[in-house]
Amino acid sequence: MTTVLIVEDEKEIRRFLRIALEGESLRVFDAETLQRGLIEAATRKPDLVILDLGLPDGDGVEFIRDLRQWSAMPIVVLSARSD
């Protein structure tokens, strides 16, 4: 089964994505922080990461750099930033 990790601090966005992805028969895990997201990515090894760039505990670009040190898993980036 294809697995997806959602790294997003907004509960409603996580919920929306989870419902949509599970509706497509994907297995979904989530994390509210970048730190937790890296832990989940390392332990669960998802097929795809959906990442919010603007989380309170850091910069999503740093998450990508950290992840790329040991994985080439695909990442879809989300952002509500206007800058």
Features from the language model and the residues they span:
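Acidic, metal-coordinating helix/loop segments flanking the phosphotransfer/catalytic sites
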Residues: 5, 30-48, 66
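Conserved acidic carboxylate
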Residues: 8, 55
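Two-component/phosphorelay signaling modules centered on CheY-like receiver
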Residues: 10-29
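Acidic catalytic/metal-coordinating carboxylates
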Residues: 33, 59-62
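Short amphipathic alpha-helix used as the core "switch/output" element in two-component signaling
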Residues: 39, 61-73
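The feature encodes the CheY-like receiver
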Residues: 56, 83
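Short, conserved "switch-loop" micro-motifs in signal-transduction and mechanochemical regulators
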Residues: 70, 81-82
